[in-house]
Amino acid sequence: MAEKIKFIIPGKPEYLTMVRLAIGSVAEVADFNIDEIDDIKTAVGEACKNISCHGKDGFAEEYTLECICEKGCLEIYVTDTSAGHKIEKLSKICADCPNEGDLGIFVIKSLMKEVELLDNPEGKKTIKMVKRK
């Protein structure tokens, strides 16, 4: 039976370490080996960086990490859930941000079995990732 786990994360870089540790624990429960867990942690870290900096119109104030976990399969959604965004993003381009086709998304696609970039009706972004054994 699939289990669902959801985290609500402030859109600040200092929370990425916590997110990586949490998703590593979830992946271990789903019975992935150490190399697969490292791949999942790296992909989720890249997705969180992409979503938190590429939220609708600026830096996301918060985002969610949702996992659907069953033995040998992990489905992960990272979604911008902000009601608002930091205004400084509107006046300049973030020099550290990749475009959707850039290295971060390439890394995610190379590490996960399936990757989708989704827009919800409110125009907010979601990165869906699936890893199977």
Task: Give the positions of each predicted feature.
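Conserved beta-strand-loop-beta-strand hairpin that lines the nucleotide-binding pocket
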Residues: 1-6, 51-133
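Bergerat-fold GHKL ATPase/HATPase_c domain
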Residues: 1-42
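Residue-level detector of secondary-structure transition/capping positions
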Residues: 27, 45-48, 82
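Conserved ATP-binding N-box helix of the HATPase_c
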Residues: 34-59
